[in-house]
Design a protein with these regions (language model features):
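N-terminal membrane-anchoring/stem segments of glycan-assembly enzymes
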Residues: 2-137, 192, 387, 397-398, ...
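Catalytic donor-sugar/metal-binding loop of nucleotide-sugar-dependent glycosyltransferases
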Residues: 324-342
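A conserved acidic beta->alpha catalytic loop
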Residues: 181-188, 204-205
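Long helical/loop segments within the catalytic core of UDP-sugar-dependent glycosyltransferases
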Residues: 201-224, 236-317, 328-329, 350-390
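Membrane-embedded multi-pass helical conduit in multi-pass membrane proteins
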Residues: 58-107, 394-479, 493-564
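Cell-envelope/extracellular polymer assembly enzymes that use nucleotide-activated donors
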Residues: 146-148, 176, 322
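The conserved acidic donor/metal-binding loop of glycosyltransferases
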Residues: 229-233
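Short, acidic, metal-binding catalytic loop of nucleotide-sugar glycosyltransferases
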Residues: 142, 164-175
Length: 615
């Protein structure tokens, strides 16, 4: 019985491959209990608002406490603590402000009116397509609009791609589904043919995912287009809940949440619940500042807005946030639709989590160093500047735990303290939990329970963010990796040796600190912090052991049939010919050149619909 309950609780990604499109605007109700509770409860409960207000008070009280000059200790540890704490206080304040800004917001009357007119039941009846919602024409401002659905593929398993494509094709509203294959796979091409969707691959790989999309926009000419990663399965009402926002000609894109269905181990649960706060509260609040940004998948774009900035931004692996900020600088509006309209996979290994966070953090630091939102050259409103500055500095909160680990070490070995001994223990007991305790309580209320996995990942991710900081500072290019996909066969320890050595050193420091306290006849607070840091580092090491053991068992049960990332499953196309410019986006929109080159290579031979598109 307990095994059955666990399987229901941690159900994997919703399978929409056999979705029945005959039920008008139906949702597939395949929710685990946690998902159902989230979907049937309001985002802002009275308890949540109370805890948020108390957390805000805790932020201000703790700030006043740590900035009191009389409490200052030795300079070096004091500077470390002040720097880290002020970063955390700033980000906590921004999160609370943004979250409370979105309180009580509902879809506008304008959206509801456009949604009511999106489909024409009388016309559908005359055309005898009432029973097939995938063929229903969509209308905005009394004119028919067309939508392309672009599914970016880069070596994912065929069964994952098939499920995603079938769900995309089953969405209500007339649209055209495309597979954008950057893995040069004949198997994917054959899958597209068997499913009846369109397929395109390009000659070359410049611009990574952004280049792949720009290349497809040369042949996919719809007024609007949707982007899905290969592992995100759309619900049938995706277009119904997003296209009506485009009734406002100033809206550049409509972003929807990333919801995960594979929360079945420590890493995936930690990574998934970290993102839940962002999508349930932060992004909706950013709507009020016109600063909600694209996250790369589950998003509807207006083609004219993308053309206005020269195409999806290709000069960064974090093309999504760069594209967003460029659009906002051009005066476009963005919308975050908080309804959960697609289900995908979050990283479930230390490798995939590390690569994802490295890419995201590098993109944030790149903006800070090369396109700082606070610069007078940025054409943003002040509230947009503040929101984007909070975004690109967010990953400093991941570096802070690593720096704070140095503080008890300095006290144990050098007798250097961040605060004077005049600070009583009960003062710490009042102000410290008032800040950190309320933050943890707030996260627990949002998630519905205390999630120790979130703390585990937060405490152990500092090497990733330090590397991202220097990658951005020194302009080191990082290899593209697919977000949400399970990593390769490498050991988890290949991606966390810094944490392993930190654990060994912290364990030794804890032993020294305990012996020191025993010799002096009293317990020092540094011992507590050493033991706590040792515990979190050790727990991460154990997580790596468990992950390696599980993957070894899986390999013993069956052969790994997943193709390597970015390696062609068949003979690749001529890699010397590029279809996407590395520096000038508009060249990626030259449809005739792309079609001629692909036709010459036989890429379109298996899919005559693309030839028809050209004609």
């Amino acid at each position: 019985v307990s095994s059955s309950r666990r399987s229901r609780r941690h159900r994997s990604k919703v399978d929409l491959s056999t979705v029945n499109a005959n039920t008008e605007l139906a949702l597939v109700d395949d929710l685990a209990p946690e998902e159902r509770r989230a979907s049937t409860s309001g985002r802002y409960s009275p308890t949540l608002l109370l805890v948020a207000l108390l957390a805000s008070i805790g932020v201000f009280a703790y700030t006043a406490f740590i900035l009191t000059p009389a409490f200052r200790g030795d300079l070096i540890p004091w500077l470390i603590v002040m720097t880290c704490e002020l970063i955390l206080i700033f980000q906590a304040s921004m999160a609370l402000w943004t979250m409370l800004s979105g309180y009580g917001r509902q879809p506008s009357y304008r959206f509801q009116t456009a949604q009511a007119k999106l489909f024409n039941p009388q016309l559908n009846s005359r055309l005898r397509i009432n029973s097939d919602p995938t063929k229903w024409p969509m209308y905005l401002n009394d004119r028919q609009v067309d939508v392309d659905v672009l599914i970016t593929v880069y070596g994912e398993p065929l069964d994952v791609i098939e499920t995603t494509v079938k769900a995309a094709m089953a969405m209500h509203g007339r649209h055209t589904t495309w597979i954008l294959d950057d893995g040069d796979s004949d198997e994917v091409r054959d899958l597209a043919k068997s499913l009846g969707c369109r397929y395109v691959r390009r000659l070359g790989s410049s611009g990574a995912k952004a280049g792949n999309i720009n290349n497809a926009l040369s042949v996919a000419k719809a007024e609007f287009f949707v982007i899905f990663d290969a592992d995100f399965v759309a619900k049938p009402n995706f277009l119904y809940e997003t296209v009506p926002f485009m009734e406002d000609s100033n809206v550049a894109f409509v972003q929807t949440p990333q919801v995960y269905g594979n929360l079945n181990n420590i890493v995936s649960r930690g990574a998934g619940f970290i993102q839940m706060v962002f999508y349930r509260f932060i992004q909706p609040g950013r709507n009020e500042f016109n600063a909600a940004f694209c996250v790369g998948t589950n998003v509807l774009f207006r083609r004219a807005a993308v053309k206005d900035i020269g195409g999806i931004y290709t000069q960064s692996k974090s093309e999504d946030i760069w594209t967003s900020i460029l659009m906002h600088e051009r005066g476009w509006r963005s919308i975050f639709q908080p309804k959960e309209l697609a289900v995908g996979d979050t990283p479930d290994t230390i490798e995939s989590y590390s690569k994802q966070q490295l890419r995201w953090a590098t993109g944030g630091f790149e903006i800070l160093f090369t396109h700082n939102p606070l610069s007078p050259r940025r054409r943003l409103r002040m509230d947009q500047r503040i929101m984007y500055f909070a975004t690109c500095t967010f990953y400093f909160t991941g570096i802070a735990p690593g720096l704070l680990m140095l503080v008890p070490i300095l006290e144990v070995f050098f007798d250097l303290r961040p605060v004077t001994l005049a600070v009583k223990w009960y003062e710490w007991a009042l102000f410290y939990p008032g800040f950190y305790g309320m933050q943890i309580l707030l996260a627990a209320v949002i998630a519905g329970t205390f999630r120790w996995e979130v703390l585990l990942l937060a405490a152990n991710s500092f090497p990733i963010y330090i590397k991202a900081f220097f990658n951005a500072l020194l302009k080191v290019d990082t290899k593209w990796s697919v977000t949400g996909a399970t990593g390769g066969k490498a050991s988890a320890f290949n991606f966390m040796m810094v944490q392993v050595w930190a654990f060994v050193f912290m364990l030794g420091t804890s032993i020294v600190s305990i012996y020191r306290d025993y010799s002096m006849g009293h317990v020092n607070i540094a011992t507590f912090w050493c033991l706590l840091n040792t515990f979190f580092l050790g727990a991460f090491v154990v997580t790596a052991f468990l992950e390696n053991r599980q993957r070894k068992q899986e390999r013993n049960r069956s052969d790994d049939t997943r193709p390597k990332r970015g390696v062609a499953a068949s003979d690749p196309l001529d890699s010397n010919k590029q279809l996407t410019s590395e520096t000038k986006h508009p060249e990626a929109l030259d449809a005739e050149a792309i079609l001629d080159a692909q036709a010459a290579k036989g890429v379109l031979a298996e899919n005559p619909e693309l030839h028809n598109r050209k004609g």
